Amino acid sequence: MNKLVKKVYGVGVGVGDKKLLTLKALEVLKKVDKIFVPVSKKGKKSIAYEIIKDYVDGKNIEELLFPMIKDKERLKKYWENALEKVLKEDGEVAIITIGDPTLYSTFSYVWKLLKERGVEVEIVNGISSIFASAAALNIPLVEGDEKLCILPQGKDLEKYIDEFDTIIIMKTKNLNEKLSVIKNRDDYIIGLVKRATFEDEKVVIGKLDEINFDEFNDYLSLAIIKRFKR
């Protein structure tokens, strides 16, 4: 008879600082029978695992390979391979992810497949890079009736720049080009954060022509664009 995992937890482990790991996440990680750790390449260090490793000494750990490629058909094979690994486990397991499992997370793809198989899934929230970056910049994201927009890689920024008070851009590669839509405007300020809450965190806030964007051309960088109300 084929085994079917009893329960799967999608656990957000935050963004870097181990002290930001939630009590609920620690509770789940300590009680599960196995912890699955997503990696983008075999042999590559997992940021998520580095965050939790001091708390899970002696636990059963297994890697899940999710390469950083855009071809969804190729990626689907890796998701399905991960699913089969998870399904064959007895008891309860956790799949960890940096940030929060509900926001641009690798876990969401496996979540869909698990739900299709009728597996019980519970999501354990983690602190997202969005909130960690706002804290690093020491600014509120939105207040009152202000509107917030999240854009992956700044896609279609020109469509939303005048509609929202705050725009979050996840993954800031080639951001300088995308921000040309506000080049000659003085009603916006830009905050950039690289590796929020890590020891080598880098933060800058200012106008477009005051920022060296090359320093933030990184997978773990994020931009917050805020409009001033006159």
UniProtKB/Swiss-Prot annotation:
CDD domains membership: Precorrin_2_C20_MT
Keywords, sorted A to Z: Cobalamin biosynthesis, Methyltransferase, S-adenosyl-L-methionine, Transferase
A Pfam family that the UniProt record links to this protein: TP_methylase
S-adenosyl-L-methionine in keyword set: yes
Pathway annotation: Cofactor biosynthesis; adenosylcobalamin biosynthesis; cob(II)yrinate a,c-diamide from sirohydrochlorin (anaerobic route): step 2/10
Lineage: superkingdom: Archaea
GO biological process entries: cobalamin biosynthetic process; methylation
Annotated EC: 2.1.1.151
Reaction catalysed by this enzyme: Co-precorrin-2 + S-adenosyl-L-methionine = Co-precorrin-3 + S-adenosyl-L-homocysteine + H(+)
Gene Ontology molecular-function annotations: cobalt-factor II C20-methyltransferase activity; precorrin-2 C20-methyltransferase activity
Keyword hit for Cell wall biogenesis/degradation: no
Family: Belongs to the precorrin methyltransferase family.
Record-given protein name: Probable cobalt-precorrin-2 C(20)-methyltransferase
Gene: cbiL
